[in-house]
Amino acid sequence: MNKEQLEKMKNGKGFIAALDQSGGSTPKALKEYGVNEDQYSNEDEMFQLVHDMRTRVVTSPSFSPDKILGAILFEQTMDREVEGKYTADYLADKGVVPFLKVDKGLAEEQNGVQLMKPIDNLDSLLDRANERHIFGTKMRSNILELNEQGIKDVVEQQFEVAKQIIAKGLVPIIEPEVNINAKDKAEIEKVLKAELKKGLDSLNADQLVMLKLTIPTEANLYKDLAEHPNVVRIVVLSGGYSREKANELLKDNAELIASFSRALASDLRAGQSKEEFDKALGDAVESIYDASVNKN
């Protein structure tokens, strides 16, 4: 593990850019960017277009390591190059810590939750991540209803996989998303917090994780989890809120920083000039940084 990157993730001021839309969500991400499905005829062309978009983001002067601590990549992006370097090396050289999305998507809903599908190639994927100088990973589950068994299952699965990731020398981001429209959201979050605490308490002193959570209904609910010795940092997802709303809610949570995807890229368009693109990205970065650093 790179100690300098660990220090940056633990104490740096800023947020994490989530650039990890995978195969399923790529057409939607491209459409929002202004690239329609008739502009590519197969998956390779689609992934090249999305890589071009991500390249435009990470090479922009607005994508500044003074504001952006890390970036989460999709497997395809890890294996591609930006300006002649593998993406993770390009980011690390720029001062941005690289993470890799490792999950294979969500299973069918059961007990009010969606567990992760089995990650059958996890070992070899983590070996490749190490070869590509990736610092950490990210994997997402989804909680839709107040169901204690379901929430327990989500957290247990996350920690089980997290321990395999830690064993390979990487720092896992555990992401049990709570749907922002869930009927008993505040109650779900209390149960989730208790289960996360159990999981964290089961780790050895040298087993470090990060958490990526939905912004809690009760402000500062996760404060003591953020202070847990095994937690490097807690980041939050925008989860369907507009950027303005997500930023507003984030400002009320002292220990949390953003890890936004859609809310970061929502004003970026393929047809923008370099100046327009850099300004739109810069405005987004500035506002998300502000919400991550300057608290109410």
From Swiss-Prot:
Gene3D superfamilies: Aldolase class I. Pfam families: Glycolytic (PF00274). It catalyses: beta-D-fructose 1,6-bisphosphate = D-glyceraldehyde 3-phosphate + dihydroxyacetone phosphate. Its EC number is 4.1.2.13. One of its GO terms (molecular function) is fructose-bisphosphate aldolase activity. Transmembrane segments: none annotated. InterPro entries: Aldolase_TIM, FBA_I, FBA_I_Gram+-type. This is Fructose-bisphosphate aldolase class 1. It comes from Staphylococcus aureus (strain MRSA252). The lineage of its organism: Bacteria, Bacillati, Bacillota, Bacilli, Bacillales. The gene is fda.
